[in-house]
Amino acid sequence: MLFTDEGKSEKPFPYLLVNLVLVDLRSSFPNLLGQLNSPEYESISTRLASAFDVVSAFIGFLVRFLEYESAENSISSLMMAPDLLFKLRQSIAETLSLAIEYLRDRWDAAEAGAMGLHPDARLGAANTSRGSHFTLAWDSKIDRASQDPLILAAVRALAIWLREDENDMLRMEAAGLTDMLMDLYRSSTEDGARLDFRSPVLVALEGTTALEDGAASLLDHNGWEVLTQDLLAILRSSSSASSEDEAARGIEIVRVLIPTVERESPGSREAWMAVVTAVAAWDVPDAEQPPVVCEFQVAVLQLVTALMENTHSGMQRRYVHSISAVLGIVEQLMDKIVKIHDEALEDSLRDVESTLSGLR
């Protein structure tokens, strides 16, 4: 395996490889914006995207290995000494911090012109006493930022690290990219989109929304509207089709939204309750479906439960008919899940049923 080392060298190959890749990335960022329209940019972008892919693969390997580490299979014996691993951790965090700066600068130049500028105030006609003209953007003449494989590779590597490494400082820095992340998510749903940023964006949001400021930034940049629109579209489509990839993305959306709901004070916003109404009107399919699709459907019901539980009694009384409809959905799903013998999903559904029944 690429990231294992059977030898006893002082600095094993995995350490040297990843360290070299990180050095290449850090040294490339300062001049990257100035090369956007150069003939060499395509090859530079491909090289750096590959470098980020190596970093992503290393982080993924490290996470999986630590999950299954045992006394006979210690990380120091298979991979590298703990002190070298600590150095790599610091180096990865430093590199990704620089990547955040680059992504911010690239996105501002391409789309906004100022950090976090609201979408309504971006590129468009500027009305002056001399007439209307369009505001400027500085970006590649050939490809938009949302079509650059380097941006996708960078976001993917950053996302995995944000979720797996509890580095609040880096998460705070990344929370400043929330407007960019939501724009990339939206662009991935457009017809003809060349790259799909949705899954990496959701993974990144898992990390940033662990902080209160990150969750607030998500809401400030229309994150709730964007994510719930996609979530409900997946739910509706699951009535007639069973896309496991779509269902997996829906589960990731719920992972982001439930902590946001639970953190909201003094309770769920009234606009959010549209999700409850939409789910209550959903038709449960009769056909047997893959386990991941059932898991997604249960996750949506858990989101509804979180919304209802975190609101005041007056709001709960207003939605009593929706609660009854959702409980009917719970009953139908339970009949299906019992047949696939998934005890964890059964327990989750019972929790949903118990909580919602107590709110009527």
Per-region residue spans from a language model:
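Extended alpha-helical scaffold regions
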Residues: M1-R360
